[in-house]
Amino acid sequence: MATLKCIDWQFSGSEAAKDAAAASLGSYTSALYALCDPHGKPILPPRNEILETSNTAEKAVVKAVLYGSGNAYAPSLGLAAAKSAVAEYLNQGLPKKLTADDVFMTLGCKQAIELAVDILAKPKANVLLPSPGFPWDLVRSIYKNLEVRHYNFLPEKNFEIDFDSVRALVDENTFAIFIINPHNPNGNTYSEAHLKQLAELAKELKIMVVSDEVFRWTLFGSNPFVPMGKFSSIVPVVTLGSISKGWKVPGWRTGWLTLHDLDGVFRNTKVLQAAQDFLQINNNPPTVIQAAIPDILEKTPQEFFDKRQSFLKDKVEFGYSKLKYIPSLTCYMKPEACTFLWTELDLSSFVDIEDDQDFCNKLAKEENLVVLPGIAFSQKNWLRHSIDMETPVLEDALERLKSFCDRHSNKKAPLKDVNGVK
């Protein structure tokens, strides 16, 4: 008797998402954690299942549950109260104020990125993405068969955008430049003057600016956060955000996309209609969280963010100071935001390390330490180190990193100064 697997079935799995999935951060992260020994020393960073958020946010969700205000389906574009609350919150410092109609609630910032890519994707179109940058922009672009062109940064100028590289990449099929501010993984925050220059360049090139601002609440450097929407009088701007990083609730899956459109360009070019159509056929963020958004945004005390930012600043100072004892890694600037250190890998310092992926694979196997390779962020032979952990745990992680580098080193390189210069 023939088994079912012997039958020549007329169906098979689609490979439509294969290439995109290979570029996702989740694929890199899962592969590295799988190399760690669950019976060895504690795996770092720990894969936390419990995150502590603001008590105000927790109360807001409980209130929505008890009142039943989050039990029903939400409109495809988002709950009116949530959209209004986001608009009011983001309007601080904006000369051109947002309305609820300019806000689209999304299933986290990832769906906001998907929305930004999908509503603009056309045959032969290309998009400018940062290198390095958050992989989800690349993942979605690959999935939509968009041509991706990577622009560069100037590490010696605190990772400002290299406008010459932007100008050289644009042609008649380029529709947008994506930026991340504060930047993941560089950790820098753009000045108002730099963002204005970007807006003027984008206007000249006739492309829009899409700004991922999800890390705006993790700022701890001297530069203030400046929203890209402030320059919508110069160029059409799309901003992306969510409560995941600021409130430490990535599992709540609630974000937004906003259209900053002074002269109705998005309406005239049918971008507004495309955004509405996209959300009509896609999943919505949890209604119960949307119902809690007004209280979360309005009532969370500043002390919550101050405490979080102080914690991150302390860890950056600690981690940055320790890196000077690892000559094979160069951190060009002390981060001003986010939860990472971004370092360049000097392959000439090692006897048996081929590239950043090989470094991270061996590090995971030998030290139970997960550091992400730069190739995951479209920049080969760099590394992203998480610093979002308590000081004793971070110290352990950095000691393991140094031990690994010393063990594989082919020489004793000179000590670097605190600025990462050899």
From Swiss-Prot:
Q: Does the keyword Disulfide bond apply?
A: no
Recorded hits in CDD domains, A to Z, give:
AAT_like
Molecular function per GO: L-cystine L-cysteine-lyase (deaminating); pyridoxal phosphate binding; transaminase activity
Example GO BP: amino acid metabolic process
Repeat as a keyword of this entry, yes or no, is no
Q: Which InterPro entries match?
A: Aminotransferase_I/II_large (IPR004839), PyrdxlP-dep_Trfase (IPR015424), PyrdxlP-dep_Trfase_major (IPR015421), PyrdxlP-dep_Trfase_small (IPR015422), TyrNic_aminoTrfase (IPR005958)
Q: What induces it?
A: Induced by jasmonate. Induced by coronatine. Induced by 12-oxo-phytodienoic acid (OPDA). Induced by wounding. Induced by abscisic acid (ABA). Induced by the cell wall elicitin from the non-pathogenic biocontrol agent Pythium oligandrum.
* First-level EC class: lyase
Q: Which Pfam families would you find in this protein's record? A: Aminotran_1_2
Tissue expr: Expressed in cotyledons, sepals, pistils, flower buds, phloem companion cells and vascular tissues of petiole, leaf, filament and fruit.
Catalytic activity field = L-cystine + H2O = S-sulfanyl-L-cysteine + pyruvate + NH4(+)
Required cofactor names:
pyridoxal 5'-phosphate
Q: Keywords, A to Z?
A: Lyase, Pyridoxal phosphate
Q: Which GO terms describe its cellular component?
A: apoplast; cytosol; plant-type vacuole
Q: Which PANTHER family match?
A: CYSTINE LYASE CORI3-RELATED (PTHR45744:SF10), TYROSINE AMINOTRANSFERASE (PTHR45744)
Q: Family assignment?
A: Belongs to the class-I pyridoxal-phosphate-dependent aminotransferase family.
Q: What does this protein do?
A: Possesses cystine lyase activity in vitro. Does not possess tyrosine aminotransferase, alanine aminotransferase, aspartate aminotransferase and tryptophan aminotransferase activities.
- Protein name per UniProt: Cystine lyase CORI3
Question: Which organism is the protein's source?
Answer: Arabidopsis thaliana
Q: Which gene encodes it?
A: CORI3
